[in-house]
Amino acid sequence: MGSGYQLLQLPRERFRKTSFLVWVIILFQRAISMPLGIVTNSTLKATEIDQLVCRDKLSSTSQLKSVGLNLEGNGIATDVPSATKRWGFRSGVPPKVVSYEAGEWAENCYNLEIKKSDGSECLPLPPDGVRGFPRCRYVHKVQGTGPCPGDLAFHKNGAFFLYDRLASTVIYRGTTFTEGVVAFLILSEPKKHFWKATPAHEPVNTTDDSTSYYMTLTLSYEMSNFGGKESNTLFKVDNHTYVQLDRPHTPQFLVQLNETLRRNNRLSNSTGRLTWTLDPKIEPDVGEWAFWETKKTFPNNFMEKTCISKFYQPTPTTPQIRARRELSKEKLATTHPPTTPSWFQRIPLQWFQCSLQDGQRKCRPKV
């Protein structure tokens, strides 16, 4: 019994040496890990991912998930006059295209068809396989002319134009896109013992009920001097009725504007063009700038719709003279369109500063 006990017990000196060796191996492995040589079919280098995850967080490319994140959550202005100022033409820069696996709903998308003064196209056709962004609440369809001083239209802030699971640095003609960036999320490796138990298969009822999806609404515009310093944007109600847009506004404002013009018979009644102008005291930011982020709180969120009839102040005109009409000072009623939760949860990302200290790589959030 005693001798058996002695066989299981290491001498104190040998125990110290053995435990010291084990700790050295553990620390050596963590501090000087081999570069991750697992990235093959990717433009990222192994060393870049190695630095990104601080050496010990990524064990397989299956843990990397590329997602497209929209810029709307940053609070940028999404109306057409403001958005087009973020885009510009350049020559001699090759376009870049990268794929992403998942995205999120977009409140505002854009679709451009711009021609030069000589009738030639400003924007290239999309390459094979590039389709429009599939999840848009509002599609702002812009047709017009401009100088287009360059071969391709890029984002001035370096963002991507997100299409259907493809992100490009340039705008393609007649193809719906939204502004965004592509990020790589690192998913933790699942423990193997999670899969030991037989998974329970629950019956799933799938449906193609369209009410569970967003209704996409297309808003049309005419723009002149696209790409120039001073551009002019008109909201198109019908082929002969337009509204001059001279300041930022929400898409909900334009929807109500369109409904009010039609309901109150304010459309052009001849073949001439009728252009309305907004009263300076009208607030064009009714509703929400983006469906997850309310920009402004209004005291009368659910105003009676009967007051909309007073929204316009008719101006006597003759059929021969097409004069601009000015909207009155009444506010539009604020209504909120039905929204659904985003199908991909927005995940806040943070930059980390990594450094090598005492043989170990340490990462801290950037301030």
From Swiss-Prot:
InterPro entries: GPC_FiloV, GPC_filovir-type_extra_dom
Statement: the UniProt record of this protein carries the keyword Acyltransferase: no
Disulphide-bonded residues: C109-C136, C122-C148
Keyword Glycoprotein: yes
Residues the record marks as carrying a glycan: N41, N205, N239, N258, N269
BP GO annotations: monoatomic ion transmembrane transport
GO CC term, one of those recorded: host cell membrane
Keywords per UniProt: Cleavage on pair of basic residues, Disulfide bond, Glycoprotein, Ion channel, Ion transport, Secreted, Signal, Transport, Viral ion channel
Feature type site, description Cleavage: R325, E326
Signal peptide range in chain numbering: 1-33
Molecular function per GO: channel activity
Source organism, top-level taxon: Viruses
Family annotation (Pfam families): Filo_glycop
Family membership: Belongs to the filoviruses glycoprotein family.
Official protein name in the record: Pre-small/secreted glycoprotein
Organism: Reston ebolavirus (strain Siena/Philippine-92) (REBOV)
